[in-house]
UniProtKB/Swiss-Prot annotation:
Signal peptide: none
Function: Peptide chain release factor 2 directs the termination of translation in response to the peptide chain termination codons UGA and UAA.
Assigned keywords, A-Z: Cytoplasm, Methylation, Protein biosynthesis
Name under which the protein is recorded: Peptide chain release factor 2
One Pfam family recorded for the sequence: PCRF
Keyword flag Transport: no
C-alpha cells in the first residue's frame, strides 16, 4: 500500500507527461521525422549545405525527443507493473520510490528540452557584466556575479573563458565578458539578462552600514558563420594594448589585447584572453558580429523579448533578482517569485532553481499570448 504523498507524486508526474503529449503530438512528429529522413536520403541532399545542416539538426532533435518519450512511457509501464507487485510484496516500495524519482527527473529534463526550441537556444553564449552606480561596492558585486556564472558553467560541465576583463580601481571589476561553450548554453542563460541587486553590510564601509548595489547582466548567442552579418572593414577602428586585470589563468597579460570600434554604431568590443593579437582579433570580431546581429534584431522587432528581453536602467525598481545578505539571507527572483535562503550555494553557482523556473515561466507566458 502506498501512502498519500507518494500517490500524489505519481498522479502529478503522469499528468505532466500527459500535458507534454497534448502539446507535442508524438504521432505527428513521427510522421515529420519520416519526411525529413526521406529528404536526407535523396541523392542531391548535400548540394545545399546550409539547408542540409538545418534539416539534419531538426531530424536529430525530433528523433531524440521521440526516443525520450518512449523511454518515459516504458518507465511509466514499469511503474504500473511495480504498483501491482507492491500489493503482494511490500519490499517493492523502495524500488517504486526510485522509479518515481527517475521518472520525475526525466520528465523535468524533457519539459526543459521542449522549451529550448527557439532559434538560438542551442548556441554558445557571451555573457557580460557591468556594475551600476556605487563605485567600489557595485564593482565588487559585479565580480561576485562573474564568479557565480563561472561556477555555474563549471558545474554544468561547460567550457568557460574570460574574453574581456576590466578591473576596478580598488576591488571588483568595471566590466567583464565570458564566452561559455556547451549544449543549449544560450537557451539556459537568456533570461538571466537584466539587473541584479545586492543588499549587504559593505566591507568597504568603515561604519558597517548596509548598502544596496546593482549590476547588469547581458547575454548574447554566438552567431554561426553561416548567418550573414555584413561588416565593412572600412567601418572598423582596431587598437591594440596590454591586457590588464586579475583574471587568473583565464586572462592573458601580454601586449596582445585588441579593441575594435564599429564606427557607424559606436559599438566597442575588446578581447584580451588569447595568446596573440590575431587570435584576440578573431574573438573580438565574433563578439562584434553577435552585437551587430543583436542590434539588427532589435531594429526589426518591437518585442525585444523575442531574443533576450528588455535591459532596463541599472537602478532601484528595475531588478530581476535580489540577493540579500543582511539582515537575513535570501535570493529572490522578482519575475517568478522563486526564492531560497541558501545564498552561499547560489553565489557558488547553484542557480538552476532560478534558470529552470524562468524557462517554464516565460514559456507559459508566451503560450497565453
Amino acid at each position: 500500500m502506498i501512502d498519500y504523498e507518494l500517490k500524489q507524486r505519481i498522479d502529478e508526474v503522469k499528468k505532466r507527461y500527459e500535458d507534454i503529449v497534448k502539446v507535442f503530438h508524438p504521432e505527428d512528429k513521427k510522421k515529420e521525422l519520416e519526411e525529413l529522413e526521406k529528404l536526407m536520403g535523396e541523392s542531391d541532399f548535400w548540394n545545399d549545405q546550409k539547408r542540409a545542416k538545418e534539416i539534419s539538426q531538426n531530424a536529430q532533435r525530433i528523433r531524440k525527443i521521440i526516443d525520450d518519450m518512449v523511454d518515459i512511457e516504458n518507465k511509466l509501464e514499469d511503474l504500473e507493473a511495480g504498483l501491482e507487485l507492491l500489493e503482494e510484496d511490500a519490499t517493492f516500495l523502495d524500488t517504486i520510490k526510485q522509479l518515481i524519482d527517475d521518472i520525475e527527473r526525466k520528465v523535468k529534463t524533457f519539459e526543459l528540452e521542449l522549451i529550448l526550441n527557439e532559434k538560438f537556444d542551442s548556441s554558445n553564449a557571451y555573457l557580460s557584466i557591468h556594475p551600476g552606480a556605487g563605485g567600489t561596492e557595485s564593482q565588487d558585486w559585479a565580480s561576485m556575479l562573474l564568479r557565480m556564472y563561472m561556477r555555474w558553467a563549471e558545474r554544468r560541465g561547460f567550457d568557460v573563458q574570460i574574453v574581456d576583463y576590466q578591473p576596478g580601481e580598488e576591488a571588483g571589476i568595471k566590466s567583464a565578458m565570458l564566452y561559455i561553450k556547451g549544449e543549449y548554453v544560450y537557451g539556459y542563460l537568456k533570461y538571466e539578462r537584466g539587473v541584479h541587486r545586492l543588499v549587504r553590510i559593505s566591507p568597504f564601509d568603515a561604519n558597517k552600514r548596509r548598502h544596496t548595489s546593482f549590476a547588469s547582466v547581458n547575454v548574447m548567442p554566438e552567431i554561426e558563420d553561416d548567418i550573414d552579418v555584413e561588416i565593412n572593414p572600412e567601418d572598423l577602428r582596431i587598437d591594440t594594448y596590454r591586457a590588464s586585470g586579475a583574471g587568473g589563468q583565464y586572462v592573458n597579460k601580454t601586449e596582445s589585447a585588441v579593441r575594435i570600434t564599429h564606427i557607424p554604431t559606436g559599438i566597442v568590443v575588446t578581447c584580451q584572453t588569447e595568446r596573440s593579437q590575431l587570435q584576440n582579433k578573431e574573438t573580438a570580431m565574433k563578439v562584434l558580429k553577435a552585437r551587430l546581429y543583436q542590434l539588427e534584431l532589435e531594429k526589426r522587432q518591437k518585442q525585444l523579448e523575442e531574443i533576450q528581453g528588455e535591459l532596463k536602467d541599472i537602478s532601484w525598481g528595475n531588478q530581476i533578482r535580489s540577493y540579500v545578505f543582511q539582515p537575513y539571507t535570501m535570493v529572490k527572483d522578482h519575475r517568478t517569485n522563486v526564492e531560497t535562503g541558501n545564498i552561499d550555494a547560489v553565489m557558488d553557482g547553484d542557480i538552476d532553481i532560478f534558470i529552470e523556473s524562468e524557462l517554464i515561466f516565460f514559456a507559459k507566458s508566451k503560450n497565453k499570448k
